[in-house]
Amino acid sequence: MPDRSLWRCPTCGQTFVAVNMPHSCAVRPIEAHLGDGPELRAVYDRLVAALGGPVTENVTKSRITFQTRMRFAGIDSPRRDHLLANFVLTRPIDSPRLASVDYIPPYYYVHRVRLAREDDVDGELTAWLAESRQVGDQRHVTDPEWPKVRQPPEWVRVPRQVAAAIARGDDPSRVR
């Protein structure tokens, strides 16, 4: 059985599935992001509860990420009146609720959703987060039946270099 231990950054203590993964060591307290405003804190707390169990919260200067084995969801620095949450799946979801969907080769899709009220964290979002949490557990690595969409639909945002590689017939996961 392969070693499934996580690498721990010796500077900040954050953990990762691979050695020396790019990250920010500018670790902050959660209050540095959410401040004293009870409205966004209530939305954040409901989002964390919807993640379905204990997760590691990695709070850095520009974002907060949620992790089981790998990072599977998070929020950008809060806006004045809303949170911009994201979650990772191995398939794209087409929904008017989503602000954007970005493709990351070979088969990851980062979905972004605006959360302004506690009610925005509803059953639909909770179901997406449950699937995303399984990606965080790396079920897609061990389950051969797990769906992996390697060709992004035209409505998904694709980085220019990745789109060029796809157009040439190259492996887009080799683009750095």
Question: For each predicted feature, which ranges?
Answer:
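Short cysteine-rich clusters marking metal-coordination/redox-active sites
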Residues: 9-12
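Cys/His-rich microdomains that often coordinate metals
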Residues: 16
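Acidic, Ser/Thr-rich low-complexity intrinsically disordered segments
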Residues: 156-176
